[in-house]
A protein has these predicted regions:
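Primarily recognizes the serine-hydrolase "nucleophile elbow" in alpha/beta-hydrolase
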Residues: 1-44
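A short helix->loop->beta-strand "cap" motif at the edges of active sites that frequently abuts
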Residues: 26, 47-48, 75-78
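Cofactor-binding loop segments of dinucleotide-utilizing enzymes, especially the Rossmann-like FAD-
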Residues: 34, 54-56
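A short beta-to-alpha transition loop/helix N-cap that caps and shapes the active-site region
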Residues: 36-41, 59-60, 92
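Short beta-strand/loop motif that positions the catalytic acidic residue
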Residues: 45, 50-53, 84
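Conserved alpha/beta-hydrolase "acid-adjacent" motif
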Residues: 58-67
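Conserved hydrophobic residues forming the short capping helix/wall of the S-adenosyl-L-methionine
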Residues: 68-72
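C-terminal catalytic histidine-bearing segment of alpha/beta-hydrolase fold enzymes
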Residues: 75-124
Length: 124
C-alpha cells in the first residue's frame, strides 16, 4: 500500500480469516511511504512486513520510522526496512522520472516489492 494504503495493509496484516480461524487474512504486507499509521496497528501486525521509507516524509516521520524499527522486530516477524535517501513522501508512485535520484528510487522500490511478494507468495 502506498501512503494511506500503508495504514490499510497494516490493518489487513493484523486481521484473521474469521473469529474461528486464526489464519492471517493476508500472507505479507509491503508499504511505501505509509501514512496515518498508529502504534496499535504496528503492534497488531501478524505477517511479514516490508517498509519502503523515503528520507524526507512529513507523514512517516523519523519517530514513527524508529517505532516501526523497534516494534516490528520485537514481534518475531520477518521484516524488511528499505531506506531511500534523497527522496520524499510519494516517491514510489509520483516520483519525477527526469530526476536521477527519484528515478533510481522508483525502480529500486518496485524491485524490492516484487522480490518481497515473490518470496512470500512462493514460500507458501
Amino acid at each position: 500500500g502506498f501512503c494511506f494504503g500503508g495504514w490499510g495493509v497494516f490493518r489487513l496484516g493484523g486481521k484473521k480469516v474469521s473469529e474461528n480461524n486464526d489464519t492471517p487474512l493476508v500472507d505479507c504486507i509491503s508499504t511505501a511511504h505509509p501514512s496515518m499509521l498508529e502504534l496499535s496497528e504496528i503492534e497488531n501486525v501478524k505477517v511479514p512486513v516490508q517498509i519502503l521509507a523515503p528520507e524526507n516524509d512529513m507523514m512517516f516521520k523519523q519517530d514513527l520510522k524508529d517505532t516501526c524499527n523497534r516494534v516490528i522486530p520485537s514481534l518475531g516477524l520477518p521484516y524488511d526496512y528499505q531506506f531511500f535517501p534523497r527522496v520524499e513522501h510519494g516517491f514510489a508512485i509520483r516520483g519525477n522520472r527526469n530526476d536521477k535520484d527519484e528515478m533510481e528510487a522508483m525502480v529500486r522500490a518496485k524491485s524490492c516489492a516484487v522480490y518481497w511478494f515473490k518470496h512470500w507468495f512462493h514460500s507458501k
